[in-house]
Amino acid sequence: MAEKRNIFLVGPMGAGKSTIGRHLAQMLHLEFHDSDQEIEQRTGADIAWVFDVEGEEGFRRREAQVIADLSEKQGIVLATGGGSVQSKDIRNHLSARGIVVYLETTIDKQVARTQRDKRRPLLQVDDPREVLESLAEIRNPLYEEIADVVVKTDDQSAKVVANQIIEKLGF
């Protein structure tokens, strides 16, 4: 891998973007970044607080800036927020500046992986499954639109998925 290429992980909440991203970056000797963690570092507050104070629109503005900044780097693995693909600008940034990998998972797996996570503002409702289904309807076609590679994450360890990504990318 002479040229340091960026790898951008997209997919729904609970697909494993952050965990798989860390493994992938380590295996490829690349820098790992997580857009949500970067937002928290820049604001000095957690995502739930940003949502409470600025609303989803404020959060999405911050997310767009973070992804624009990070995607300028070379040789990174970036785990993006699940909703980032709803922005055409972000989709364009990701497509133009690296390889986009869509980590696909089922609603059942999303529910299982996110049910105890209180840091996901969109899921703090009576019926998180309904929210996840609604988001999937909107976002899944967008993930597919920009994906260079699609990898299913259900019932596989993060390390196995990272290896599959490396294999599919020919690294």
Curated annotation (Swiss-Prot):
Pathway info: Metabolic intermediate biosynthesis; chorismate biosynthesis; chorismate from D-erythrose 4-phosphate and phosphoenolpyruvate: step 5/7
Gene3D superfamilies in alphabetical order: P-loop containing nucleotide triphosphate hydrolases (3.40.50.300)
Cofactor: binding comment = Binds 1 Mg(2+) ion per subunit.
Instruction: Give one GO biological process term.
Output: amino acid biosynthetic process
> Catalytic activity, per the record?
shikimate + ATP = 3-phosphoshikimate + ADP + H(+)
Which terms in the GO cellular component ontology are assigned? cytosol
Q: What is its EC number?
A: 2.7.1.71
Q: Where in the cell is it found?
A: Cytoplasm
Cofactor (UniProt): Mg(2+)
Q: What does this protein do?
A: Catalyzes the specific phosphorylation of the 3-hydroxyl group of shikimic acid using ATP as a cosubstrate.
How the protein assembles, per its UniProt entry? Monomer.
Q: What is this protein called?
A: Shikimate kinase
**The organism of origin for this protein:** Shewanella oneidensis (strain ATCC 700550 / JCM 31522 / CIP 106686 / LMG 19005 / NCIMB 14063 / MR-1)
Organism lineage string: Bacteria, Pseudomonadati, Pseudomonadota, Gammaproteobacteria, Alteromonadales
The gene behind this protein is: aroK
